[in-house]
């Protein structure tokens, strides 16, 4: 087992990793920027070292600083969390070169999965369904036009190195392509340092279904069921649940088998997620991408399987074989997660970080809260606007929905706006209750959801 781990991240995921390490008897070293000097993960870690100014490029993305701290503090492992360097193949390689265990897949696997266009080719060869699209990258508007003509409109232009909804543009007709191509390439270059693009057919009104996978170095690969992440805004997930209500047992088995194939195709090791689009007929699904890290929403899978995914990451990275077999995985009950973001939905989801004047999280049976906030702390403007994840678990989906409603009624944060009220309204929407939400749900219903919230606020009625 690893003896001391550097947690190369911040916020709630740093806390999540820290807690798992403690329970396994692994010592922890936290890193922090000057803006995070009072952060909770800094206070709870065995050691904490400042690695630079607030700007992420000078701190949490500073590979040399992270590796220097890891070696100086006697660490033998590095956990990247999610975001920042978690899917950076060069960082994984640099850790290995420095004699440190990167708690994630190899740099080679990250590269294979990280290039979206190359990953599509790999999946196609492995027998995993992919959406119709270009054969590899499109280097010019002319190539994009030819590919779009072949598969038919509407189409998506997507960054090969993309993620987080960035570097994506929808085109409904040929006249849209030229401007969209330039915009997407520029955004991809700015966000990822790579402007390579590919094109794929847009699946209208799909569901976003993803499968959690675990793989060890001995060739054992399993999936731990599915998550429905269809409630999104700007390609960013807002509410996630497990298992997906829309899947039949037969379809779940087919998609799970495809997820395992996908992991094997890239030579995967550790925890990862294979994302699919499920079309409206609920018969055809298509590989979208593979996330080579722990996911923000991993908690809903933990609740319905009883498997501690971060603990599994640490065990696998320590060279231990998976003890869990596919037949051991049972999905029991239902879990829902609401991401609480410091943003104002009325103002176009404008980030609104600031000081937490007062904070109260919900509790009770079947409730879990993952957050780094406390009353009096500052939510920094330099990083992601997520303030907390609230999870509710119950024997049935409807009970889980009711429990989450109660959680959001209890949740109180004074100091800045959040999207909690919007999530609360979604939980009452008929489409959500019936499990019929597609990725278009929020675009189609946002105005009515916000209007209902406004009327309740003006009337003084507590929803």
Residue spans for each PLM region:
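N-terminal non-cleavable signal-anchor helices
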Residues: 139-142, 152, 462
